C-alpha cells in the first residue's frame, strides 16, 4: 500500500483497532444525523458484531482518519461480498471536515485493499467495487465521479407513520407459524436465498453467514419474525426487528410460486400491525428503487413514503466473467 494521502498535516490515516468501535459508531451517527436520517446509523454493539463476521478484520479491512488529538473524523470499511471479486466499501466523513481530502484518502486506501485481496479471486472473474452516497451528499457523489465510479443503482429507505394497526388477509391456504430456530432456521435460510436470487447484487449465502447476520445480531427477536407457510412449504417471510428507535422490516420476501397472490402486501401489513401492537408507530425498510420483482409497489400501496435516497456507485477493477448472481 502507498503512504500517499490527500490529507493536510493536521490529519492522519491509520488502520482501525477494536478500541475504535465506540468512536466510529459515534461518527456514523453524527454523519447520518447531518444527512437527516439517523435510522440508518448503527450502535456500537451492532458495529462490533459486524466487525466479527468471518473474513473481515477491522485491523486490515477498516481505516480511520483522525485529528492530531486523536478524534476520529473519517471511517471506511471494505467487505469481500463474494469470491474476492465483488467488494463493497462503506465510509463516513464528519460534516465539519468535508472537503479536506478525507473521503478520497479513505476510498483510495479501500481500493488498494481490494486490489490486494482480488489476487485470491479466480483469474477470469470480473472484479468490481460498490459504494454508496446519500442522495443529498453532493460532495460524496462528486468524489466518486472523480475517482472513476459510475452510478449503477438507487436505493430508498421508505417509512410509514401508523395511526392504527392495519387489517390484513393472508391468501387462501397460507398461515403464520411462530419461528422456531431449531426447526425452521434452515428452511428460512433456503427460502431467503431463493426469494432474492433475482435481486440486483444478490448471491446465495451459506447457512453460517446467514445465521451470523440474521440470528446472532444483537437485536434479533424471533417473536418479530413472520413466517408464512403453505402446508410444509415456506411461502414468504418478513424478518422484522427494531432498529435505531423504529420498527424495521429487515428482509421481506416471497418465493416465486406464491407471488402475485397478495402475500407480500399481507406480510407488510401484518408487520405493521405487529409493530403497532408493540407500541411502535414508525416503521421503515430499505429497497432497491429499480427492483425487477416490483418490490417497491406494495410498499407504496401500503402508504409508505420515500424518507431517504442513496446512490450506489460501481468501479470495475478488472474485466472478466460475471459472477453468477451479479
Identify the role of each PLM range.
Residues 1-7, 79-173, 309-315:
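Acyl-donor-binding surface of acyltransferase catalytic domains
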Residues 89, 129-131, 249, 283-287:
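Conserved hydrophobic beta-strand within the GNAT/NAT acetyltransferase core sheet
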Amino acid at each position: 500500500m502507498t503512504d500517499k494521502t490527500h490529507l493536510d498535516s493536521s490529519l492522519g490515516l491509520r488502520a482501525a483497532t477494536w478500541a475504535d468501535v465506540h468512536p466510529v459508531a459515534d461518527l456514523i451517527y453524527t454523519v447520518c444525523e447531518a444527512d437527516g436520517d439517523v435510522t440508518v446509523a448503527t450502535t456500537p454493539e451492532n458495529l462490533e458484531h459486524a466487525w466479527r463476521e468471518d473474513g473481515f478484520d477491522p485491523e486490515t479491512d477498516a481505516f480511520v482518519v483522525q485529528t492530531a488529538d486523536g478524534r476520529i473524523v473519517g471511517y471506511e470499511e471494505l467487505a469481500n461480498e463474494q469470491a474476492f471479486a465483488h467488494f463493497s466499501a462503506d465510509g463516513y466523513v464528519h460534516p465539519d471536515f468535508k472537503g479536506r481530502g478525507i473521503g478520497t484518502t479513505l476510498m483510495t486506501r479501500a481500493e488498494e485493499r481490494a486490489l490486494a485481496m482480488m489476487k485470491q479471486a479466480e483469474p477470469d472473474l470480473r472484479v468490481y467495487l460498490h459504494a454508496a452516497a446519500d442522495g443529498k451528499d453532493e460532495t460524496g457523489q462528486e468524489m466518486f465521479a472523480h475517482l472513476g465510479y459510475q452510478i449503477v443503482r438507487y436505493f430508498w429507505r421508505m417509512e410509514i407513520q401508523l395511526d392504527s394497526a392495519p387489517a390484513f388477509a393472508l391468501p387462501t391456504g397460507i398461515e403464520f407459524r411462530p419461528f422456531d430456530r431449531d426447526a425452521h432456521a434452515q428452511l428460512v435460510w433456503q427460502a431467503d436465498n431463493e426469494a432474492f436470487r433475482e435481486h440486483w447484487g444478490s448471491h446465495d449465502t451459506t447457512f453460517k453467514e446467514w445465521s451470523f447476520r440474521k440470528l446472532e445480531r444483537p437485536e434479533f427477536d424471533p417473536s418479530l419474525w413472520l413466517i408464512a407457510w403453505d402446508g410444509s412449504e415456506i411461502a414468504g417471510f418478513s424478518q422484522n426487528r427494531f432498529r435505531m428507535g423504529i420498527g424495521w422490516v429487515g428482509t421481506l420476501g416471497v418465493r416465486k410460486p406464491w407471488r402475485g397472490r397478495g402475500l407480500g402486501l399481507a406480510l407488510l401489513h401484518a408487520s405493521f400491525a405487529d409493530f403497532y401492537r408493540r407500541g411502535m408507530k414508525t416503521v421503515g425498510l430499505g429497497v432497491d428503487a429499480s427492483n425487477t420483482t416490483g418490490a417497491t409497489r406494495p410498499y407504496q400501496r401500503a402508504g409508505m413514503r420515500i424518507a431517504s435516497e442513496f446512490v450506489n456507485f460501481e468501479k470495475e477493477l478488472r474485466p472478466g466473467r460475471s459472477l453468477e448472481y451479479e
